[in-house]
């Protein structure tokens, strides 16, 4: 049995919380490439813009590596949103106290592959 890896693009250290990006990622995982691009372009979320950039990059890599492919034959085979490092920031509170704000970062990985026998 042949294992296929596909064409991968990664964006790291994005200043958006993974919990805000994951619902957007769940909408396009497994969709065809043109359909995923159309869905993401219509969404207002910041996470949609970031996923769209990584998705277009993965599509460009696929078309560059394999010149026989076209965009219609690609689909999103894997899309993961992982936690990145956290920036700790101080938020001043009353009576000389403080709270710690965690600015969360995300790592987005998109893998596109050719549809085979679908």
Question: What is the role of each PLM region?
Answer:
Residues 28:
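Short, positively charged, Gly/Tyr-enriched micro-motifs
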Residues 2-15, 23, 31-118:
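Structured, basic alpha/beta domains of bacterial-type, RNA-associated proteins
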């Amino acid at each position: 049995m042949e294992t296929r890896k596909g064409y991968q693009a990664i964006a790291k250290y994005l200043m958006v919380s993974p919990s805000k990006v994951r619902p957007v990622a769940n909408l396009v995982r497994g969709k065809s490439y043109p359909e995923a691009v159309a869905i993401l372009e219509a969404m207002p979320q910041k996470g949609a813009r970031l996923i769209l950039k990584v998705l277009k990059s993965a599509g460009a890599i696929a078309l560059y590596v394999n010149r026989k492919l076209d965009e219609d034959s690609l689909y999103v085979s894997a899309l993961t949103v992982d936690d990145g490092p956290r920036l700790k920031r101080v938020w001043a509170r009353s009576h000389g106290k403080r709270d710690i704000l965690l600015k969360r970062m995300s790592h987005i990985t998109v893998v596109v592959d050719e549809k085979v026998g679908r």
